[in-house]
Amino acid sequence: KDLSPKTSDTIVSYGERLSSIIVTELIEGAQWFDSRTFIKTEKKHNKHILDAELTNELVKKAFSSVPKVALVPGFISSDKTTGDVTNLGRGGSDYTAAIIAAALDANSLEIWTDVDGFMTADPRVISTAYTITELSYVEATELCNFGAKVVYPPTIYPVCHKNIPIIIKNTFNPDGVGTVIKQEVSNPQSKAIKGISSINDTSLITVQGLGMVGVIGVNYRIFKALAKNGISVFLVSQASSENSTSIG
């Protein structure tokens, strides 16, 4: 009857916590690390946001002596003030790996998933879609934000900041070519369009009227109202005459 965000975060954390402990026991020489002790968040606008500075410091301390194999439960974190269990959102395990890789200045970040990497389109819709071998950080971020669910979007920033390449490989097809995400691709002008992605079940709202023309702060009021209600905008289009603004 009582499912508060705090209770929910605690319940959903058990999957990663238990599975990582089990895998640790199966791998010789492996050591388990509790990510709640070094992945720290703070509450802003009713959301748990990573405290990057504190987290980086704690990660470096936790991994000052790295064992042969380190197992870390992804996705879960803890509030830096209360110590309560929090999480990094759906897909947060990728984000956990990126945070640790960036803090430790890793040579690369490998993400093993169930697809061969980024595709030129959704293969369930376009049968001729094929794997994109190279993407820049910006290109990958755009594809992720618009529906390509290969990598959790926040994953890219920590490693991009440190110029650490991300290698996407398929667990069920380890010999597949995969996708490498890095600062600069080998031939950036090879294709004007790298890939096509789409988002289902989204809303597009247009605010229009001649009374908007030349009026300062209209968009500010729109975005303020959305932010107040915890709504994030991923698409904005405005007419040059300023008489309409479309948001998605």
Q: Predicted segment positions?
A:
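Nucleotide/pyrophosphate-binding catalytic subdomain
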Residues: K1-I156
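A broad, low-specificity signal marking well-ordered, structured residues that form hydrophobic/aromatic
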Residues: A30, A70, T86, I166, ...
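Generic beta-strand/beta-sheet core signal
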Residues: F33, V72-G74, W112, P153, ...
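Short, glycine-/Ser/Thr-/acidic-enriched flexible segments
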Residues: I76-S77, S93, D105, D116-G117, ...
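Active-site C-terminal subdomain of aminotransferase-like
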Residues: K162-V177, N200
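A conserved regulatory-domain signal marking ACT and ACT-like small-molecule sensing domains
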Residues: V177-G248
